[in-house]
C-alpha cells in the first residue's frame, strides 16, 4: 500500500487551463511548459497511467506536450465507466475501447487522429493518436484485465514513442486501476494539493499537482 512507502516525489505542478474542462484549445503556454517539464521528468518512460482528480487534464497535457516535441504519442482513455474525452476533443464517442474489448470493433475502427494547432502544435510531425473509452461500461475491471486489453496496450507501447493512459479514478472500486497499473511503466497521481489519495493499491511513480 502507498501508505507504507515513502511518499512519491512531485514531478510537476501544472496550472489549470482556462475554463472548467481540459480542452485542447484551452491549453496555454504555461500549461504546455509545465507538461513539457513533466515529460522531461518521465524521460525514458514509454507508457504512463494518469489517475486522480485531475487525470484527464494532465494526461491530455502530457500527450500534447510530447506530440509537440515531435514524438509519436497515443492517448488512451480507460475510464470506461465515465467516458469524457470524446466531446472535449471533438471526437466520435463510439466505437471506442469498450467496444474493442468486447470484440465488437477492431483496432483500426477505434483509432482517431487529433491534429494539433496553434501554440500546442510546436514541432509536431504527426497527429496525436486517440482512442476514447466508447460506450459506458458499468463493470470495467474484467475488460481492463483481459488478454485483449493487455495485448492492445502492449501493441500501442511498441507502436508509439509514448502511450498516455487517461485512467480510472482512485475512489472505491480500484480493480480497474490495479489492472492497468500492471500494464504500464509509470503511474502518476494528479490533483490539487490536499485532494490526492494517500493510500493506493498500486506503486506510484510520482505526483502531479494541478491548479
Stretch-by-stretch model annotation:
Residues 2-21, 134, 201-211:
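Beta-strand-loop-alpha "switch" segments that mediate conformational coupling across diverse proteins
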Residues 56-63:
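Motif I (Walker A/P-loop) of helicase-class P-loop NTPases
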Amino acid at each position: 500500500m502507498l501508505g507504507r512507502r515513502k511518499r512519491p516525489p512531485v514531478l510537476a505542478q501544472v496550472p489549470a487551463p482556462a475554463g472548467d474542462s481540459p480542452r485542447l484549445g484551452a491549453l496555454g503556454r504555461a500549461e504546455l511548459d509545465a507538461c513539457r517539464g513533466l515529460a522531461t521528468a518521465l524521460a525514458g518512460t514509454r507508457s504512463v497511467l494518469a489517475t486522480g482528480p485531475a487525470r484527464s487534464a494532465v494526461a491530455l497535457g502530457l500527450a500534447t506536450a510530447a506530440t509537440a516535441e515531435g514524438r509519436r504519442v497515443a492517448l488512451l482513455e480507460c475510464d470506461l465507466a465515465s467516458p469524457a474525452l470524446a466531446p472535449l476533443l471533438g471526437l466520435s464517442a463510439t466505437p471506442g475501447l469498450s467496444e474493442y474489448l468486447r470484440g465488437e470493433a477492431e483496432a483500426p475502427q477505434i483509432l482517431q487522429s487529433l491534429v494539433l494547432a496553434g501554440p500546442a502544435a510546436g514541432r509536431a510531425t504527426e497527429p496525436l493518436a486517440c482512442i476514447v473509452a466508447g460506450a459506458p461500461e458499468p463493470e470495467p475491471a474484467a475488460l481492463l484485465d483481459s488478454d485483449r486489453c493487455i495485448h492492445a496496450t502492449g501493441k500501442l507501447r511498441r507502436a508509439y514513442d509514448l502511450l498516455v493512459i487517461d485512467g480510472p479514478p482512485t475512489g472505491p472500486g480500484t480493480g480497474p486501476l490495479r489492472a492497468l497499473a500492471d500494464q504500464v511503466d509509470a503511474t502518476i497521481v494528479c490533483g490539487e494539493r490536499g485532494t490526492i489519495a494517500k493510500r493506493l493499491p498500486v506503486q506510484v511513480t510520482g505526483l502531479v499537482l494541478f491548479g
